[in-house]
Amino acid sequence: MMNKSNFEFLKGVNDFTYAIACAAENNYPDDPNTTLIKMRMFGEATAKHLGLLLNIPPCENQHDLLRELGKIAFVDDNILSVFHKLRRIGNQAVHEYHNDLNDAQMCLRLGFRLAVWYYRLVTKDYDFPVPVFVLPERGENLYHQEVLTLKQQLEQQVREKAQTQAEVEAQQQKLVALNGYIAILEGKQQETEAQTQARLAALEAQLAEKNAELAKQTEQERKAYHKEITDQAIKRTLNLSEEESRFLIDAQLRKAGWQADSKTLRFSKGARPEPGVNKAIAEWPTGKDETGNQGFADYVLFVGLKPIAVVEAKRNNIDVPARLNESYRYSKCFDNGFLRETLLEHYSPDEVHEAVPEYETSWQDTSGKQRFKIPFCYSTNGREYRATMKTKSGIWYRDVRDTRNMSKALPEWHRPEELLEMLGSEPQKQNQWFADNPGMSELGLRYYQEDAVRAVEKAIVKGQQEILLAMATGTGKTRTAIAMMFRLIQSQRFKRILFLVDRRSLGEQALGAFEDTRINGDTFNSIFDIKGLTDKFPEDSTKIHVATVQSLVKRTLQSDEPMPVARYDCIVVDEAHRGYILDKEQTEGELQFRSQLDYVSAYRRILDHFDAVKIALTATPALHTVQIFGEPVYRYTYRTAVIDGFLIDQDPPIQIITRNAQEGVYLSKGEQVERISPQGEVINDTLEDDQDFEVADFNRGLVIPAFNRAVCNELTNYLDPTGSQKTLVFCVTNAHADMVVEELRAAFKKKYPQLEHDAIIKITGDADKDARKVQTMITRFNKERLPNIVVTVDLLTTGVDIPSICNIVFLRKVRSRILYEQMKGRATRLCPEVNKTSFKIFDCVDIYSTLESVDTMRPVVVRPKVELQTLVNEITDSETYKITEADGRSFAEHSHEQLVAKLQRIIGLATFNRDRSETIDKQVRRLDELCQDAAGVNFNGFASRLREKGPHWSAEVFNKLPGFIARLEKLKTDINNLNDAPIFLDIDDEVVSVKSLYGDYDTPQDFLEAFDSLVQRSPNAQPALQAVINRPRDLTRKGLVELQEWFDRQHFEESSLRKAWKETRNEDIAARLIGHIRRAAVGDALKPFEERVDHALTRIKGENDWSSEQLSWLDRLAQALKEKVVLDDDVFKTGNFHRRGGKAMLQRTFDDNLDTLLGKFSDYIWDELA
């Protein structure tokens, strides 16, 4: 029998948490609800005091405080799990009158473990033996005497007279605390408001007292205290028992809708399946295995009477997926006969037969020798899912019905209804639907969009879980996604699809496309009841849900409301190159001493949460995107789209060069300059060194208004802000964009006196604080006459479709090929309404000289910003010396190396800047003194000395330097503020050169000669090139695309050839690439391709007495040739040809002579008489 509190050891250490724990015990088992409420209070009080000890700033609520604790590397996952369990179940008790006795017992046990951990931490009694936990048996008021004692102390305090003001305040604090304790101990029901206030006041009083104690210590003493707390906390875990680990797993299962209690819901204690009840029954006996031994499944999950899953759950599961083998054994050895006999003792034969038929369903394993009896197998150790150590955490499961199904890690359990739905699905049958329904005519797709959808379907049928689709910007990725989702839902292969975007504007654009798209007369929205950005959770009937990453982070990662892992079974990721970043794998040392939140992107955590097939859409698949999703299952390139006539080509870039951009700007040491602070203030400065600025530095480190003015004046010769062709200008910063807007308005106002103010505006993320208003501005740019010229930084770099953009101006240096391609993609769309036949790029910052080539892209990795204090903590922690990294050095040595490098950079910057700023100089002098005292060198030699002496010596030095890191952080801030202020230079500038860029060639004549030379010396380089030169009728569309891409790689684009010919011969001839090849190879005259087609058509019409129907089709064929250049079977599968019956119908129209007719067209087009 329990004769004293399990939490007795807290008495005198933290009387407040002790009193709360006593009250929780006092109400067990008579009032589980109050026990749960008190244990929630216990968790809050413990966390709040822990936050105080660890210098965590005050948080608004317990959830935020725990998130901050989670960022501290030493706080073990299990500790956070216990805090969260106490909080969540306590919230249920407060708000829903949750009154579960088992939960109350679990919270007492877990709170006890937490109390032991806390006690060891704050008392430094690290070897404190864990007392035996005794569960309170009945509601004896064990604390009656304690309440009486407290009341006597209260009366005595009231009678005592305080003399000084300090004594008065101390007495008041004591009275508040005593009243709080009494209110807590006497509370048998939910607290009244007065009791709540007393509790909070008591807590605040005690924390204030603790804070006052800390404040009396010196800074060095406080630092030493915090260090010791941290050091020891790293070593301490909760050391949960098997039973307590099961408590956590039980809670996870209950969160997912299962009845779970490892103590009472056990087979040995009579727990049996029940109709209409979803149970996780522990220690269920299985049949004998191959060795003849009978086993016991840790859990069998029953939906009603039906066993649906088996679970291997062990505290010491290190590699969780490896223990799935145990779960497989449970499934293979599961004895359905025994289950039927057990159920027949309680239920009718009909009920039993329906749930467990005598003819049992089973599934063959990979060996072919054994069969699985239970379809879903799980393994877990109760540890929260961590992407950076996936195999040692989370809930691993596998659907064993198909040998091709792989095991997966999940952060939550499947819900019962989700498993039933999965069990009822028939993937093979649903996959067959795609083969049985290949037609997509009702979807109105282009041929390549159909090919893309088929490629995705083929990958799904093969069992691929991550799928990448690469389609050039402007080729209808959203339309393709709509068609793909339509068919995926129609096939019933997927029940609910998440369309995930990383910005609200992209989501609204997608929703608009869904509303505009009609299938068989109905809008896509109306067919599937699509839920949008404002819908928090989709209803069961919802088939498609559009959401931003940010909203799902709040709903999934920062909410107590559970997000089922099977809420979506397919996720379509739009613009996948943007937010979806490859996560950095942590080293052993980083795993132990640094927070995983630094390493895992929110995007990745969201996608990892759901048990779903992920389909990513992008125009520019970077290396990191491919590493995540695999190679694209289908590609449709920009060049192919141009050849197909679905996108327009670009003219050769127009380079605008000013005198300062060409010569650079050189400033000498000692020169007086003005800097502009972020607040717009002018700061006088003297240069300490020579500085040489190139055009890439313009409007970053150097602001020359005359440069922007000269460029804007030159643009007036090419752009018309009163017309319908629109322009997008990319700037460096928001401040730069503001300057450019004013310069453009001033320049164009001179040429167009009637220019309206809104013809030229800025649209950036901070153009308006309301995101909806920014979206409205983008919509105006797209659909209204004004604005005509928009200046931006990076808001419109990707995903926004505005077909009327005909000009792209780069006033910002871009080195990333992916970003450049995305920016350029804003202008590639067709827009005949504004007479758009090509688009122009204006390069004002020499962008092509430094643009990265595609094959030099490197993975984009989340590289956490490691703070100086973190590195210092790591070298002063003895445990970091015991962790060996891959190169054989300790984690402390790695941290020391990073620390020295960071210090060296700060020292270098400080030395350079100290004469420029009196504030910095003063700080460096103080640092000189501190370093001299602690390390025997001045600040300038500090990093070198640390490197020389090593991490142990460095750790001792930093222990002598309290507040040193704070000083360094202040110094860094002041240096950055000084250096970030760009130099303002009021000098003249003028445009000295405007020319079209032809790759490596200075003149269009050189460009054409190089093209001719390439053709003449490489006739065998491409099979299609041979066909063009020797037998054009053999050229296929596939060959034409490959040929076009081959010339593109040599930087001989068709549009550049046309422009170069025009500049050298003063003739604008649309001869197409084939015309230029034949001119260079066989000397054909350069004539417009359309003229050649018309000549061939006239000749063919004169050869026969064609019917009116045949003449109409001849005209259509000629028009198709003008657009496509080459006609082959694929052309007849799309558009008007397809709608009118395809190639078969044309064969009948031309008496089975269609191929001969097409051959004549090809011959006559290139006839020497043409």
From Swiss-Prot:
CDD domains according to UniProt: DEXHc_RE_I_III_res, SF2_C_EcoAI-like
BP-aspect Gene Ontology terms: DNA restriction-modification system
DNA-binding residues (ranges): 431-450
Miscellaneous field: Type I restriction and modification enzymes are complex, multifunctional systems which require ATP, S-adenosyl methionine and magnesium as cofactors and, in addition to their endonucleolytic and methylase activities, are potent DNA-dependent ATPases.
Identification of the protein by name: Type I restriction enzyme EcoKI endonuclease subunit
EC number: 3.1.21.3
Entry-linked SMART domains: DEXDc, HELICc
Coiled-coil segments: 143-229
Protein induction: Encoded in the hsd locus, in the order hsdR-hsdM-hsdS. There is a promoter upstream of hsdR and another between hsdR and hsdM. This probably allows expression of the methylase enzyme before the restriction-specific subunit.
Job of this protein: The subtype A restriction (R) subunit of a type I restriction enzyme that recognizes 5'-AACN(6)GTGC-3' and cleaves a random distance away. The R subunit is required for both endonuclease and ATPase activities but not for modification. Has endonucleolytic activity that requires Mg(2+), ATP and S-adenosyl-L-methionine (SAM); ATP can be replaced by dATP, no tested molecule could substitute for SAM. Generates double-stranded DNA with no nicks, by cutting one strand then the other within a few seconds. Cleaves only non-methylated DNA, hemi-methylated and fully methylated DNA are not substrates.
Keyword list, A-Z: ATP-binding, Coiled coil, DNA-binding, Endonuclease, Helicase, Host-virus interaction, Hydrolase, Nuclease, Nucleotide-binding, Restriction system
Organism annotation: Escherichia coli (strain K12)
Oligomeric form and interacting partners: The type I restriction/modification system is composed of three polypeptides R, M and S. The restriction enzyme has stoichiometry R(2)M(2)S(1). The methyltransferase is composed of M(2)S(1). (Microbial infection) Interacts with Escherichia phage T7 protein Ocr; this interaction leads to the inhibition of the type I bifunctional endonuclease and methyltransferase restriction enzyme R.EcoKI composed of R(2)M(2)S(1).
pH dependence statement: Optimum pH is 7.5-8.0 for DNA restriction.
Database matches in InterPro entries: EcoEI_R_C_dom, Helicase/UvrB_N, Helicase_ATP-bd, Helicase_C-like, Helicase_Restrict-Modif_Enz, P-loop_NTPase, Restrct_endonuc_type1_HsdR_N
GO molecular function: ATP binding; DNA binding; helicase activity; type I site-specific deoxyribonuclease activity
